[in-house]
Regions:
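Conserved short alpha-helical segments that host acidic/polar catalytic motifs at enzyme active sites
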Residues: 1-300
């Protein structure tokens, strides 16, 4: 049992309040996922010539400056690093593939948890309220945000096993449910060149999406294909550079509710998380249909 929540702002005047609006939504899902929590927030887009990386290390005192200086020397590029908790946001004009390769060769202890132009991913073990505070998200500004509270069922309680999982540039996925064919699919995807850091079934779903997108599918097509290729019960919430997308499996036994006002669109495992938003009492509220892709902001 896990909790997933998402908030997309239609009213740009609310951007400065995104973190404050989202915090009670995430915390409300604590009883569904007290083991760990994570968020993907979309903010501060880089130049087109730059890439923003979300990096993580188990040591909160890790020296990120050596990553900064090492990349600049090795790749002859410009870098800027910002430490947030045991994570780091790295912005660089180096090629993404070159950065990932260099990190694997010289600093395998560092995990790349996301990349793109606007996405920033933060995740950690512990109660959602503590995780949110650790990464200073209370006053965060942005356009949209998705989050997850985890009660581990398929793998260990670790930071690496926490959601969201990156699925491509400015793309990430959170999941409520359980996939029964993730071990077989993981081996199939490994043969296609996909790499895995955990035994988490959600990481397999994220890798599946990445593979589909790399081989020509649109996000909507990838989500529709998942309905037949992935066995199990699931609700997926996928963050994109300009919005988010939602899909439930054909049986739709995992809870999900959506709501929309003139100011925002929200999704949550349970309505009580949405009820905390301003204007929720006047929102259009509905349960997403089985096997149907919903998207906002050009998300799919």
């Amino acid at each position: 049992m896990c909790g997933i929540v998402g908030l997309y702002l239609k009213n740009p005047k609310l951007k400065s309040k995104l973190g404050a609006m989202f915090k009670p939504m995430l915390i409300e899902m604590t009883n569904r996922g007290p083991d760990s929590a994570g968020v993907a927030i979309y903010r501060n887009p880089t130049k087109k010539s730059e890439t923003k990386f979300s990096l993580a290390h188990d040591d909160a005192n890790y020296d990120w400056k050596k990553i900064d200086l090492g990349l600049e020397r090795a790749l002859k590029c410009d870098c800027n690093v910002k430490k947030i908790g045991n994570h780091c946001i790295l912005v660089t004009n180096a090629k993404e593939a070159s950065v990932v390769k260099w990190l694997k060769q010289h600093h395998p202890e560092v995990r790349v948890v996301g990349s793109g132009h606007s996405i920033e991913i933060f995740k950690e073990t512990g109660l959602p309220a503590n995780v949110y505070e650790k990464f200073h998200l209370d006053d965060a500004s942005g356009t949209h945000i998705i989050g997850h509270t985890r009660m581990a069922t398929e793998s260990a309680v670790t930071t690496a096993g926490s959601h969201p999982f990156a699925t491509g540039a400015d793309l990430c996925l959170v999941h409520n449910g359980s996939l029964s064919n993730h071990n077989r699919l993981r081996e199939t995807l490994r043969k296609e060149g996909m790499e895995f850091q955990t035994e988490n079934d959600t990481e397999v779903a994220a890798a599946y999406m990445t593979h589909k997108l790399r081989t020509g599918s649109t996000l909507k097509q990838a989500l529709e294909s998942s309905l037949t290729d992935l066995d199990g019960f699931f609700t997926f919430l996928v963050g994109t550079g300009d919005g988010f997308a939602v899909v439930r499996d054909p049986i739709a036994c995992k809870h999900a509710v959506m709501a929309e006002t003139d100011d925002w669109v929200a999704m949550a495992t349970e309505y009580r998380a949405i009820a905390l938003l301003p204007g929720a009492d006047k929102a259009k509220i509905w349960e997403p249909e089985p096997a149907k892709v919903y998207s906002w902001g050009g998300g799919a």
